[in-house]
Each structure stands twice: as structure tokens, then as C-alpha cells.
């Protein structure tokens, strides 16, 4: 790394909604500072996963150090790229804590969107210097002046220094680099000399183990230091090397000093040993107080993952273990189901997190899997005063011992064009939402604030919102509190046998509609047998919906040409008895498609 001058360091992040051009602007900054040679340049350089490139999203934070010459001085610009999605908001908050400034990228045609709003508020809470960037000014629909006013009126940011740019053509990129140097303050000179470094991410490397990404707040960290983690108060480790992102992770001589961003390796083997937001300090001269803001990341929803072919169980176990190496938020627990066999109960931070894990298992490990419907964590208060937390219908206790149940709620902000207001209000009403306030974002768009049960969000809220707003609506949510709710267990019985994979926890008002839709769906996907198959939805053993798969008919009188009717009656009677016996002892085989179809139900 080049000469160290604290006043020449700039640590910044990029805040943007999906598809507003964050990764493309990062590419242009890397090009303009010659961090990457032209022949090595490719689109979305910092997005290393194929999934990130295809979806146009950032899943893992990717830091990079750039050197920029300005007015005869060389500045070290540390970009700490962050995931934009609400599922990863804790990681975003830690990454922003490692910065002094942020670039707020807004599409000059689309304007401010919900996810960028959520992250701007996180940045404002940390008192970061925010530079608004109006991207995609080359588009015919771009209206930079209108978007400037939107940012000023709704977010309350001064847009005097806002920069209009086009990441596609490169226009305005040099102005962005100048603004980073001029407007974002350098790191403050630390008052302490003891090492304090904020962990904002970690990565598993098969050769060196865990690489811990840090921003050094005070002191320095170098090879040979013995370090410990303050919040988790675990063992101590010897630092085997320190490095920087140039743009690839590269080991360096010397140390990482106050204000700098880099990583260290220390013979750590599990990501779970390294907690995002924790403080690193040395054992010899340890800091007295850790950095503020650390909290454990806990999953907010769960789903079962099962291999379609039971012989793939060990391969699935291996796949999940490997994914967990780079994803400390993913929790895994072995479970078994009568219908689906052996599988895993996995915990996720949200729907996007869940989708990403599923897709990676299928793509990277070439496995066919079935996932049960996602479930949130319910609080069950029993009559004896005890409290249980359950995320699986199989753990639902006997209703006679339940005092009441509580479900998690979330605060939701929805940004939408005005003409879709009534459709969104109907959607939120259907999802048991409570309207808090409605504000004008500009002449044509509104911001709606709602409280909604998390269970209603995880099913299909995003799809329905996109559907009723023709793709123009966007939303973000943050976890709220637990509230009392009439939550019950809905069981599905096939041929009078309960099938655990189809049972779910639902609100009483939605139970009948949900039960009916599952029964109707199963009639279409379970093949006919030689006997009638009843499909029933039941609550507390009381049937609330029923469909019947008709028996395959066999003409047993086909060989009787004319003759006495009693002969035919005898054959029909014999067939009837046989079908009755088959119904008693016959097993209904449920195809895998049935499980997949039921998951598609709202």
C-alpha cells in the first residue's frame, strides 16, 4: 500500500435501489482510477456471483481500495460496497458505520425508491456526508431537476452538490471522484492508541480460512499480533497476515492503521466465530470499551429443504454446510418429515435471502430440492405462564393448553404512483394491514406507511404489489413488535391421513380460503386410484374444506352380454366390497409436483 496519510483517506459507501446503476458506477470509478487494467475490466466487477450479475443485485459486500491523484496529492479511496436489500439491513448498517460518507445513486428517470430511502435513513442516523448522484441522464425519460426536488423535499438533503452523470457513457464520473475528495471528510484522528477495528464482513477462503474484513478505528493491526473479539469474548488468535483490496484481496507488508480498510487472516475456520459488528482488539493492549451497535443476527423466517431423491441427503448436507461457510446468518438443523423424508430446517433473514440460498443449491451443487412454505416465528403463551417460540407447524402444542398466540409485525413503506393508491390499500387491507400515514413524494407519487403481519409479507406480497402497480411500486420493511393474533394450525388429510408437509400455521380469518385452495390444487395433481380419495382441510379435527378425487372406473360387466340383471348386480357388489377394502388398506402415493404446487398457493 502507498504512503499513509490519515487526512488523505476517504471511506465511502454507495446507496442505491436495485437497478439504479450502483455496480456500473463502481466499475467506472475503478476504471477512472486505473485500479483495474482495461483488459481485465468486465461489467459488475465487484459482483462476483453469477446470481448477482443476473439479478443486478449485490448479495455480499465487496470492498475495494482505489488511489486517486488530485491537486498534486494521492488519495486513498476505500469503497465499501453494500447489499442494497432490506434483508441485509444489519450488514448495511455495519458497513455504513465503517464510512464517513456515502454516494446516494438515484435513477434520473425513476426517482427515489423505497429501498434507497431505507438505507439513506441508516446513513443519516450515522451522520454520514451524503452526495446525491443522478444517474442515467442519457435516458430520454431522465428528468434530473425533478429528481433533485424530490430528494430535497422528501429526504431533506441539500442537492447543491448533486452530480448528474451517466455510468453508461462515463459522463460525470470525474466530478464524482472530485466530490468524494472535497466533500467526504477524512477519518477522525483517534484519541486512543489501543487497537479497535470494526468487523463489517467475512469471507471463507479454502486455502487460508476465514478472511475478516475490518475498518481500523484506532491503533494498528499487523502480522504476529494476538487479537481477540470483544463482543463475543472468545479465544485469542494470532494474526497470520494483513491485506488490502487492490481490487483483489492481496496480502501486504506492514500494518493496517487507523482509518484504513482491509482484512486479516488468523487461522479461523468457521464464519460463525466471526460476528459482523464485533470489535477486534489486541490481547496485550486491549481496548476498554467495544464499538457501539453490535447485535447478534437472528433468522426471521424458516423453511424446510428436502432432497427430491432421498439418496441426495448427504450431498444436500454438504451443500448447506459449504454455503454456511460464507453466510453466518444461515442456520441449519436436521429434521424429518413423514411425507418428505430427511431434510433440514433452515433459518433466513428474509425472502430474498431464502431465494438466493435455494437458487445456489440448485445451480452450484446441481441438486433437485423441495422447499416447504416459509414460516415466521410465532410466540405461544401457555396457560401455565410459559412462553414458546415456534416456527414449524409440527411444534404447535395442544390448543387446550394455549392462552394466546402472538405474531411478528413489520413497518412497511410503499412508494407508488398515485393512480394505484386504491389497489394498494385493498391489497394491504386483505393482508390485515394497518395504515399509519400517506405522504406525497412529488406530484405523481406517494409514500404509504403501513404496519403488516410478517407472515403476510413472506408469502406473495411483493408479487401482488408489482402486479397491482404494473411494476412501478416498491417497498421496504423493518421488523416491529409481536402482537396478539388468532393463529391456528391448518391440517391437510389425504385419505383420512394427515400429511405433515402440507400443514401450516395461518390466521383464523384466512384458514378456510387457504384450506380450500390447497384441497382444490391437490385434486388436480394427485393421480386417480381405483378407490375414492377424500382430501380434507381441518382445524382441531374439524373439517372446514373437502374435495374428492373420483375413483378410476372399471367396467366389470363388460363380458355380460344380455342375461339376468342379478348377475351384473353381483359383480357390482363384489367390486364395491373390493374398493372398500382398498380404501382401508390402500396407500395414496403423493407425487413431488403436489408439494411444489401447494407452495405456489398464496
Swiss-Prot record:
Gene from which this protein is expressed: lepA
Alphabetized UniProt keyword annotations: Cell inner membrane, Cell membrane, GTP-binding, Hydrolase, Membrane, Nucleotide-binding, Protein biosynthesis
Chief location category: membrane
EC number, as in UniProt: 3.6.5.n1
Binding-site residues, GTP: 19-24, 135-138
PROSITE patterns: G_TR_2
Entry keyword annotation includes Nucleotide-binding: yes
Example of a GO MF term: GTP binding
Family indicated by similarity: Belongs to the TRAFAC class translation factor GTPase superfamily. Classic translation factor GTPase family. LepA subfamily.
Any GO BP annotation: positive regulation of translation
Subcellular location: Cell inner membrane
Protein name per UniProt: Elongation factor 4
Role noted for this protein: Required for accurate and efficient protein synthesis under certain stress conditions. May act as a fidelity factor of the translation reaction, by catalyzing a one-codon backward translocation of tRNAs on improperly translocated ribosomes. Back-translocation proceeds from a post-translocation (POST) complex to a pre-translocation (PRE) complex, thus giving elongation factor G a second chance to translocate the tRNAs correctly. Binds to ribosomes in a GTP-dependent manner.
Bilayer disposition of the protein: Peripheral membrane protein
Residues annotated as domain tr-type G: 7-188
UniProt-listed InterPro entries: EF-4, EFG_III/V, EFG_V-like, EFTu-like_2, LepA_C_sf, LepA_CTD, LepA_IV, P-loop_NTPase
CC terms in the record's Gene Ontology section: plasma membrane
Chemical reaction(s) catalysed: GTP + H2O = GDP + phosphate + H(+)
Amino acid at each position: 500500500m502507498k504512503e499513509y496519510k490519515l487526512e488523505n483517506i476517504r471511506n465511502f459507501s454507495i446507496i442505491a435501489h436495485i437497478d439504479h446503476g450502483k455496480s456500473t458506477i463502481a466499475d467506472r470509478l475503478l476504471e477512472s482510477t486505473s485500479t483495474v487494467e482495461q483488459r481485465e475490466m468486465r461489467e459488475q466487477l465487484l459482483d462476483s456471483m453469477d446470481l448477482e450479475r443476473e439479478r443486478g443485485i449485490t448479495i455480499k459486500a465487496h470492498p475495494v481500495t482505489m488511489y486517486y491523484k488530485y491537486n498534486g496529492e494521492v488519495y486513498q479511496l476505500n469503497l465499501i460496497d453494500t447489499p442494497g436489500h432490506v434483508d441485509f439491513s444489519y450488514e448495511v448498517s455495519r458497513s455504513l458505520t465503517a464510512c464517513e460518507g456515502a454516494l446516494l445513486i438515484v435513477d434520473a428517470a425513476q426517482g427515489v425508491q423505497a429501498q434507497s430511502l431505507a438505507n439513506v435513513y441508516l446513513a443519516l442516523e450515522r451522520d454520514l456526508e451524503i452526495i446525491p448522484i443522478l444517474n442515467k441522464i442519457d435516458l430520454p425519460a431522465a428528468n434530473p431537476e425533478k429528481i433533485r426536488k424530490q430528494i430535497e423535499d422528501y429526504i431533506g438533503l441539500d442537492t447543491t452538490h448533486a452530480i448528474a452523470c451517466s455510468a453508461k457513457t462515463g459522463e460525470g464520473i470525474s466530478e464524482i471522484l472530485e466530490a468524494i475528495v472535497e466533500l467526504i471528510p477524512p477519518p477522525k484522528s483517534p484519541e486512543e492508541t489501543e487497537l479497535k477495528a470494526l468487523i463489517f464482513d467475512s469471507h471463507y477462503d479454502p486455502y487460508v480460512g476465514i478472511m475478516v474484513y475490518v475498518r481500523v478505528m484506532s491503533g494498528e493491526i499487523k502480522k504476529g499480533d494476538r487479537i481477540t473479539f470483544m463482543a463475543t469474548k472468545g479465544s485469542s488468535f494470532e494474526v497470520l497476515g494483513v491485506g488490502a483490496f487492490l481490487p483483489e484481496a492481496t496480502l501486504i507488508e506492514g500494518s493496517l492503521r487507523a482509518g484504513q480498510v482491509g482484512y486479516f487472516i488468523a487461522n479461523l475456520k468457521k464464519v460463525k466465530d466471526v460476528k459482523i459488528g464485533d470489535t477486534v482488539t489486541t490481547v496485550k493492549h486491549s481496548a476498554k470499551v467495544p464499538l457501539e451497535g453490535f447485535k447478534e443476527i437472528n433468522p426471521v423466517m424458516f423453511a424446510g429443504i428436502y432432497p427430491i431423491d432421498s439418496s441426495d441427503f448427504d450431498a444436500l448436507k454438504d451443500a448447506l454446510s459449504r454455503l454456511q461457510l460464507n453466510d453466518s446468518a444461515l442456520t441449519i438443523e436436521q429434521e424429518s418429515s413423514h411425507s418428505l423424508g430427511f431434510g433440514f430446517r433452515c433459518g433466513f433473514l428474509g425472502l430474498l435471502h431464502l431465494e438466493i440460498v435455494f437458487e445456489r443449491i440448485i445451480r452450484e451443487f446441481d441438486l433437485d430440492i423441495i422447499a416447504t412454505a416459509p414460516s415466521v416465528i410465532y410466540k405461544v403463551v401457555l396457560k401455565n405462564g410459559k412462553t414458546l417460540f415456534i416456527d414449524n407447524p409440527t411444534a404447535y402444542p395442544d390448543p387446550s393448553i394455549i392462552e394466546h398466540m402472538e405474531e411478528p409485525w413489520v413497518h412497511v413503506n410503499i412508494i407508488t404512483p398515485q393512480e394505484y393508491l386504491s389497489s394498494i390499500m385493498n391489497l394491504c387491507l386483505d393482508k390485515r394491514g394497518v395504515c399509519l400515514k400517506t405522504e406525497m413524494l412529488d406530484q405523481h407519487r406517494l409514500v404509504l406507511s403501513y404496519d403488516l403481519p410478517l407472515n403476510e409479507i413472506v408469502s406473495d406480497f411483493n408479487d401482488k404489489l408489482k402486479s397491482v402497480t404494473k411494476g412501478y411500486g416498491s417497498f421496504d420493511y423493518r421488523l416491529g413488535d409481536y402482537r396478539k393474533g388468532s393463529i391456528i394450525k391448518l391440517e391437510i388429510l389425504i385419505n383420512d391421513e394427515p400429511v405433515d408437509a402440507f400443514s401450516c400455521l395461518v390466521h383464523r380469518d384466512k384458514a378456510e380460503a387457504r384450506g380450500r385452495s390447497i384441497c382444490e390444487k391437490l385434486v388436480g395433481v394427485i393421480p386417480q386410484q381405483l378407490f375414492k380419495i377424500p382430501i380434507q382441510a381441518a382445524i382441531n379435527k374439524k373439517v372446514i374444506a373437502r374435495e374428492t378425487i373420483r375413483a378410476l372406473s372399471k367396467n366389470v360387466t363388460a363380458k355380460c352380454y344380455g342375461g339376468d340383471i342379478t348377475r351384473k348386480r353381483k359383480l357390482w357388489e363384489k367390486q364395491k366390497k373390493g374398493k372398500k377394502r382398498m380404501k382401508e388398506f390402500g396407500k395414496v402415493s403423493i407425487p413431488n409436483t403436489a408439494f411444489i404446487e401447494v407452495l405456489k398457493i398464496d
